[in-house]
């Protein structure tokens, strides 16, 4: 231990302050000197600016030391032992956050402690001599923080100061410390302290003092902080950085320089005198309510202060892991300056920061190679930046310094940093400050720092120590920009439009293996750096409001708020605005681009979706906005409009009321945008109105035409009645007499048709009317004559299947019994005026199963017949000449019947088997007609026995035209499409050998005779508009109530598999169902026979459409049944209900 006598102590004291007679007794406090003289061992005292070299020493006990730099402040954790105990033994005095009395900030050559606590002497910094009787002036605004590597005067040290030297020259890395013991266990016992020494201490040292940490509550029994989740610590750290400190009590205190501090012992009074203190004292947060207070500190060492004194080192801020998230942490100490609510107050215009180049930020990893959460990082500009309303930017004077405070919260204990080359071990952390140009961010602006002698030197990065789970506060002061911005001069008292700006960048970087990696960085708003006095630029009367170039006008540069001090637009008014004129908006086409016409239909839809409501504003909002709360309003809701028209709604940030209530993300509506939507909607309504007017005009014209036609009909009826009741001489009288009574009517009609009545004479009109009446009378007489002639012709000729059957000319007798399978008929070949003779076979169903007579009808088509009496042939040939299809001579079937299909039921259908017969002609020209021999074979499809089924949900699609019988479909108003399919196969044919079905008339009971029988009123083939009427009925009782059989001729050129549609109409709603499809011949094509019918569905309504197909047979028959609504059934049991059967027999004309 170095022994210093009293004389040398006095010499050191006075040399350190250079007073030389300038000191007065009232300005000197010699209490510290007197205490040193009176005490035997004053090893716990620390003198400023000791000129003689001293040996290094380290404190190995658990008591924290006084911070060596005013800018780095740490708070020791409560209950967890001393702060250095978390990271092993304390580092030597050159520690980056030094725990001794020097202020070398890691830049002094302080080596590690040697064994025994001694080491080489540290060279003192030479002091600049001062003139006798004078004191050095304080630097500008001496209340600022002076935290930067202390400027060393040695040239070789100045040349070698780099971030690398900061890491290795200053302090040994804290990453090399052993892991700390658990917080709930006491730290290792402190070893005996080595002999202390007093290194060099700078004169003008300004430090910020923190109050002593109070005794906090002890941890709960058995509660281990390491077992708690890591995210709670992260939330606490983030809460610390964002903590609003408005509720903390503040007490203003006077700023004092270190040279004015009275010498005293190292207690709280002496520390408050030596250390510069910001306005407001530090207040600890209240204790946790569930903790019982107990002393958290370990046994005090030799240098530990008493219970009422202040520790020499206020350690870093630590968030207790046991503290629940969201509540104030008992381990946090906040000063009312840095964490006060002044920075959060929107009225306080402080410079804002935002992250800078986040894509270049590196990631930290712990010793287990696990990625650590992102550290919390916040930057505050405490001093030096003033907001200029005229320039709308922050202004910094180059000769005045600024100050920056950084809060860094480290989550976890980092050991490695992730680089493009992989993980690298960390050496140290440091802060780097520099400026950039707004127009060129790659151009860097150097930052300078003023010294105590008012000299400026380049600012070097600041080495910081970041313990885990703590927040470190670093304050860097007395900073200056090395240059000013360009174009600072005003033009005519207004801001220069070519003004250039700087931005300040504060970055936290990590050093690893001679490389620097950015961990976090923030960049400030635009800054104007001026070299002149701000009084030359700022003027409260000229800059804010001044006269403009136009007479009687006032100019203001910036935003204007009326009844509000936070305008976010050019003009914000809280209250009503009365405008006697108009509001103008720019609308010149020359100032617009991408002009596109809108769809007014969509605008009408959007307007129709908007909801108008009546409402009143809440009283707290009305008071803040300056409007009346009781006045009812009508308008829209912004949230609803945002869903319909997002561009009409804008977010204006948080709305704070006078009572403190806040509406986050307050929404406002652009009513001008909604007005334009209304314009488009009105245009669309105009279009609809024009269309309606056009249609109304058309309807009016049609109504006028119908009125004219009705008047003409009335005139015609009057003329025809006069023609039939009077003689020819009375026609003129009937036409002239009413003329005298109708001049106004004729005049009104002529005025509507012809504008000039003089152009048409009265005599011309009379003649025209008489001529019309005569022509009408002649037409009526002609129509009557033709009708009488047609009735007589129909009596002579009987219409059968589109041709006339001449019963008197052809012999239809000789129907004698023949063997089963054929019949014989003779027809004379006479020279009548008939065309091609056609032999057809029309079976007559009887009740006898064994004997089935056949009727051979000789039908001819007249070469010349009366108009309207000819039967139309179904001819659907699209190309001429049409090839003859399915007209080959019929083949003789084998005597044995075919095999029955699997779906065949022989008890349902019986097709007649005609008996073989011969056809003899007359004596002159008698020809034996060919006999068709069909033995017990009748091809057909039947659904007899299949009951009524409900509607199926899954309907099969229609078959392709290649299928012989595509899906049948009946169309009605309330009937779905129905279908049945099947590609014909030879083996799938169904044979009908049972007795014939009895008709409904035979099976009905007497009680049903009085009930109305459902029937069809009209039948038509839609494809060629061919109506099927009674002309297609066969002679006899083929068409009678309850059973209608139509014989429809098909031309030989009609292609096979042609799909047609039967349109069946009824006067009342009925049900129609397809019961069977039959044919008695062999098919014309192999493999073209339809399969068995599936279950059919009836169609209901008054209009029914059923698809049918021209099959590959010469003859085939469709059987439909019409019944009451919902009672259609093809089974024999359904015959007791009123029903009507319709048979459509198609046959080819192959002559």
Curated annotation (Swiss-Prot):
A motif (Nuclear localization signal) lies at residues 254-257, 491-494. It is an enzyme of class 3 (hydrolase). The record marks 586-587 as: Cleavage. GO terms for molecular function: DNA-binding transcription factor activity; DNA-binding transcription factor activity, RNA polymerase II-specific; identical protein binding; peptidase activity; sequence-specific DNA binding. Disulfide bonds: none annotated. Residues 680-711 form a coiled coil. Keywords: Acetylation, Activator, Autocatalytic cleavage, Coiled coil, Cytoplasm, Differentiation, Disease variant, DNA-binding, Endoplasmic reticulum, Glycoprotein, Hydrolase, Membrane, Nucleus, Protease, Transcription, Transcription regulation, Transmembrane, Transmembrane helix. Glycans are attached at residues 919, 1043, 1065, 1129. Residues 178-198, 292-305 have a biased composition (Pro residues). Changing residue 587 to A: Prevents autocatalytic cleavage and generation of Myelin regulatory factor, N-terminal part. Belongs to the MRF family. PANTHER family: MYELIN REGULATORY FACTOR, PTHR13029. This is Myelin regulatory factor.
């Amino acid at each position: 231990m170095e022994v210093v006598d009293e004389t040398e102590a006095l010499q050191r004291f006075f040399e350190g302050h250079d007073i030389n007679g300038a000191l007065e007794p009232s300005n000197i406090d010699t209490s510290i000197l007197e205490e040193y003289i009176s005490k035997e061992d004053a090893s716990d005292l620390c003198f400023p600016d000791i000129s003689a070299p001293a040996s290094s020493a380290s404190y190995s006990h658990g008591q924290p030391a006084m911070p060596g730099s005013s800018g780095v402040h740490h708070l020791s954790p409560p209950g967890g032992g001393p702060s250095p105990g978390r990271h092993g033994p304390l580092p030597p005095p050159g520690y980056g956050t030094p725990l001794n009395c020097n202020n070398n900030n890691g830049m002094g050559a302080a080596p590690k402690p040697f064994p025994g606590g001694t080491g080489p002497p540290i060279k003192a910094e030479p002091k600049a001599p001062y003139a006798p009787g004078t004191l050095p002036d304080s630097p500008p605004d001496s209340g600022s923080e002076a935290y930067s590597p202390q400027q060393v005067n040695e040239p070789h040290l100045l040349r070698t100061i780099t971030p690398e030297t900061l890491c290795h020259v200053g302090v040994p890395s804290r990453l090399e410390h052993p892991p700390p013991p658990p917080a709930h266990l006491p730290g290792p016992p402190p070893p005996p302290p080595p002999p202390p020494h007093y290194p060099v201490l700078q004169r003008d040292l300004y430090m910020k003092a923190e109050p002593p940490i109070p005794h906090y509550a002890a941890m709960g029994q058995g509660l281990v902080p390491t077992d708690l989740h890591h995210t709670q610590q992260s939330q606490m750290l983030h809460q610390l950085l964002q903590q609003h400190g408005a509720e903390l009590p503040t007490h203003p205190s006077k700023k004092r320089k270190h040279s004015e501090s009275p010498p005293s012992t190292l207690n709280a009074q002496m520390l408050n005198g030596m250390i510069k203190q910001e306005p407001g004292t530090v207040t600890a947060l209240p204790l946790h309510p569930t903790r019982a207070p107990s002393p958290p500190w370990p046994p005090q060492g030799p240098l530990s202060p008493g219970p009422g004194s202040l520790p020499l080192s206020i350690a870093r801020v630590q968030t207790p892991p046991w503290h629940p998230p969201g509540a104030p942490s008992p381990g946090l100490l906040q000063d009312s300056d840095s964490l006060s609510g002044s920075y959060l107050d929107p009225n306080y215009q402080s410079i804002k920061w935002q992250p800078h180049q986040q894509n270049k930020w590196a990631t930290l990893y712990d010793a287990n190679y696990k990625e650590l959460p992102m550290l919390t990082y916040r930057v505050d500009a405490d001093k030096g930046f003033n907001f200029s309303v005229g320039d709308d930017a922050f202004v910094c004077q180059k000769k005045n310094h600024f100050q920056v405070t950084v809060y860094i919260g480290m989550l976890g204990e980092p050991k490695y940093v992730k680089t493009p080359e992989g993980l690298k071990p960390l050496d140290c952390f440091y802060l780097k400050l520099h400026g950039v140009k707004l127009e060129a961010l790659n151009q860097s602006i150097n930052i300078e720092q003023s010294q105590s002698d008012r000299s400026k030197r380049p600012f070097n990065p600041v080495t910081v120590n970041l313990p885990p789970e703590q927040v470190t506060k670093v304050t860097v002061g007395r900073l200056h920009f090395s240059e000013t911005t360009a174009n600072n001069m005003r033009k005519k008292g207004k801001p220069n439009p070519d003004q250039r700006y700087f931005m300040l960048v504060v970055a936290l970087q990590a050093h690893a293996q001679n490389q620097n990696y950015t961990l976090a960085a923030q960049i400030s708003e635009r800054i104007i750096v001026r070299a002149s006095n701000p009084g030359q630029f700022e003027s409260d009367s000229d800059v804010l409001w001044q006269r403009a170039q136009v007479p009687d006008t006032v100019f203001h540069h910036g935003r204007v708020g009326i009844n509000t001090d936070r305008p976010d637009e050019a003009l914000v008014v809280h209250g009503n605005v009365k405008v006697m004129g108009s509001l103008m908006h720019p609308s010149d086409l020359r100032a617009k681009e991408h002009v596109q016409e809108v769809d007014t239909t969509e605008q009408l839809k959007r307007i129709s979706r908007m909801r108008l409501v009546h409402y009143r504003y809440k009283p707290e909002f009305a008071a803040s906005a300056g409007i009346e709360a009781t006045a009812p309003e009508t308008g829209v809701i912004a949230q609803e409009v945002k869903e319909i028209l997002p561009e009409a709604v804008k977010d204006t940030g948080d709305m704070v009321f006078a009572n403190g209530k806040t509406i986050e993300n307050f929404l406002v509506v652009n009513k001008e945008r909604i007005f334009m939507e209304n314009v488009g909607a009105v245009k669309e309504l105009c279009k609809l109105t024009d269309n309606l007017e056009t249609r109304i005009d058309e309807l009016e014209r049609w109504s006028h035409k119908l009125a004219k036609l009705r008047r003409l009909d009335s005139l015609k009826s009057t003329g025809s009645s006069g023609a039939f009741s009077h003689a020819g001489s009375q026609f003129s009288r009937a036409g002239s007499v009413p003329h005298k009574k109708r001049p106004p009517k004729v005049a009104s009609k002529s005025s509507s048709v012809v504008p000039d009545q003089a152009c048409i004479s009265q005599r011309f009109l009379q003649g025209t009317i008489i001529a019309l009446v005569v022509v009408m009378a002649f037409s009526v007489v002609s129509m009557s004559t033709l009708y009488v002639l047609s009735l007589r012709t129909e009596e002579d000729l009987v219409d059968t299947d589109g041709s006339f059957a001449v019963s008197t000319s052809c012999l239809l007798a000789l129907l004698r019994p023949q063997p089963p399978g054929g019949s014989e008929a003779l027809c004379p070949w006479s020279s009548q005026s008939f065309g091609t003779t056609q032999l057809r076979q029309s079976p007559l169903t009887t009740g006898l199963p064994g004997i089935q007579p056949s009727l051979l009808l000789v039908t001819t088509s007249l070469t010349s017949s009366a108009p309207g009496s000819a039967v139309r042939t179904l001819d659907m040939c699209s190309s001429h000449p049409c090839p003859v299809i399915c007209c080959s001579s019929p083949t003789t079937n084998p005597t044995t019947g075919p095999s029955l299909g699997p779906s065949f039921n022989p008890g349902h259908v019986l097709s007649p088997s005609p008996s073989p017969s011969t056809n003899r002609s007359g004596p002159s020209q008698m020809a034996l007609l060919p006999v068709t021999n069909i033995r017990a074979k009748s091809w057909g499809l039947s659904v007899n026995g299949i009951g009524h089924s409900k509607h199926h949900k899954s309907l099969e699609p229609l078959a392709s035209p290649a299928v012989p019988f595509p899906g049948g479909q009946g169309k009605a108003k309330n009937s779905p499409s129905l279908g049945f399919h099947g590609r014909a196969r030879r083996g799938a044919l169904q044979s009908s050998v049972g007795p014939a079905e009895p008709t409904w008339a035979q099976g009905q009971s007497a009680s049903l005779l009085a009930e109305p029988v459902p029937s069809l009123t009209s039948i038509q083939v839609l494809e060629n508009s061919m109506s099927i009427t009674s002309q297609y009925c066969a002679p006899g009782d083929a068409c009678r109530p309850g059973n209608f059989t139509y014989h429809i001729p098909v031309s030989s050129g009609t292609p096979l598999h042609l799909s047609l549609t039967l349109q069946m109409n009824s006067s009342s709603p009925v049900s129609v169902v397809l019961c069977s499809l039959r044919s008695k011949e062999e098919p014309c094509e192999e493999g073209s026979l339809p399969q068995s019918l599936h279950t059919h569905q009836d169609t209901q309504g008054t209009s029914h459409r059923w698809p049918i197909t021209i099959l590959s047979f010469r003859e085939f028959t469709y059987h439909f049944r019409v019944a009451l609504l919902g009672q259609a059934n093809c089974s024999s049991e359904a015959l007791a209900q009123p029903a009507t059967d319709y048979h459509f027999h198609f046959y080819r004309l192959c002559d």
